[in-house]
């Protein structure tokens, strides 16, 4: 299974592609899609969609994973992000790929073992989980890899959820369950 994780933004969009085969994960690629800073929002969204289509054509993912929409205090920013997310979803759906969405807490829980982790904690954990020498930069890229990892973790690519049961309750039992699920991280 090959999953493309996408962390959408109007100025830069992170992406990360992870393949899972026989229980082993490998990063196929990751980076940023950066529309021209001088363009209007509509032009940047168009460039983002073109860049995303190129990533999908090159990496050939079987599914795409996104973080659910986050609504902060800035209404204008939330509206812009909503437009960007809508364009990303439309692009992916147009190309016939399934889309799965995960709450930020689900992603953090899958990567670090705690849903309250900071972005930097997610970034520092991913190299250990994915066999990387160091965490890719910037955080938009590690966020995208974390989203893809969440989708692939614990069979999520087959069940459509990350660490959650149908009732919405976490399957995690805390650090003990995380350590049991990731013995390769023990020194």
Curated annotation (Swiss-Prot):
InterPro entries according to UniProt: RNaseH-like_sf, RNaseH_sf, X-over_junc_endoDNase_Mg_BS, X-over_junc_endoDNase_RuvC
Compartmental location: Cytoplasm
Matching Pfam families: RuvC
Annotated positions binding Mg(2+) 1: 7, 140
Keyword set includes DNA repair: yes
Cofactor binding remark: Binds 2 Mg(2+) ion per subunit.
Catalysed reactions, semicolon-separated: Endonucleolytic cleavage at a junction such as a reciprocal single-stranded crossover between two homologous DNA duplexes (Holliday junction)
Top EC class, one word: hydrolase
Residues that coordinate or bind Mg(2+) 2: 67
EC number annotated for this UniProt entry: 3.1.21.10
GO process terms (BP): DNA recombination; DNA repair
Keywords recorded for this protein, A-Z: Cytoplasm, DNA damage, DNA recombination, DNA repair, DNA-binding, Endonuclease, Hydrolase, Magnesium, Metal-binding, Nuclease
GO molecular function, one term: magnesium ion binding
Superkingdom of the organism of origin: Bacteria
Cofactor(s) needed for function: Mg(2+)
Active-site residues, record numbering mapped to chain: 7, 67, 140
CC annotations in GO: cytoplasm; Holliday junction resolvase complex
Entries under SUPFAM superfamilies matching the protein: Ribonuclease H-like (SSF53098)
Key word Hydrolase present: yes
Description of how the protein assembles with itself and partners: Homodimer which binds Holliday junction (HJ) DNA. The HJ becomes 2-fold symmetrical on binding to RuvC with unstacked arms; it has a different conformation from HJ DNA in complex with RuvA. In the full resolvosome a probable DNA-RuvA(4)-RuvB(12)-RuvC(2) complex forms which resolves the HJ.
NCBIfam families assigned to the protein according to its UniProt record, in alphabetical order: ruvC (TIGR00228)
Recorded family membership: Belongs to the RuvC family.
Function as written in the Swiss-Prot or TrEMBL entry: The RuvA-RuvB-RuvC complex processes Holliday junction (HJ) DNA during genetic recombination and DNA repair. Endonuclease that resolves HJ intermediates. Cleaves cruciform DNA by making single-stranded nicks across the HJ at symmetrical positions within the homologous arms, yielding a 5'-phosphate and a 3'-hydroxyl group; requires a central core of homology in the junction. The consensus cleavage sequence is 5'-(A/T)TT(C/G)-3'. Cleavage occurs on the 3'-side of the TT dinucleotide at the point of strand exchange.
Protein name (Swiss-Prot/TrEMBL): Crossover junction endodeoxyribonuclease RuvC
UniProt source species: Chlorobaculum parvum (strain DSM 263 / NCIMB 8327) (Chlorobium vibrioforme subsp. thiosulfatophilum)
């Amino acid at each position: 299974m090959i999953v493309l994780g996408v962390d959408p933004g109007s100025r830069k969009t992170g992406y990360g592609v992870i393949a899972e085969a026989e229980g082993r994960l490998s990063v196929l690629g990751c980076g940023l899609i950066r529309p021209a800073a001088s363009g209007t929002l509509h032009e940047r969204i168009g460039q983002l969609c073109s860049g995303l289509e190129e990533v999908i054509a090159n990496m050939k993912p079987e599914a795409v994973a996104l973080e659910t929409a986050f609504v902060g205090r800035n209404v204008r920013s939330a509206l812009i992000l909503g437009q960007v997310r809508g364009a990303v979803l439309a692009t992916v759906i147009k190309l016939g790929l399934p889309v799965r969405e995960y709450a930020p807490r689900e992603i953090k829980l899958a990567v670090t073992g705690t849903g309250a982790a900071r972005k930097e904690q997610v970034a520092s954990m991913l190299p250990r989980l994915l066999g990387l020498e160091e965490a890719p930069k910037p955080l938009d890229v590690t966020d995208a890899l974390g989203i893809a990892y969440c989708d692939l973790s614990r069979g999520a690519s087959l069940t459509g959820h990350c660490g959650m049961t149908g009732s919405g309750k976490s399957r995690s039992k805390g650090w003990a369950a995380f350590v049991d699920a990731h013995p390769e991280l023990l020194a």
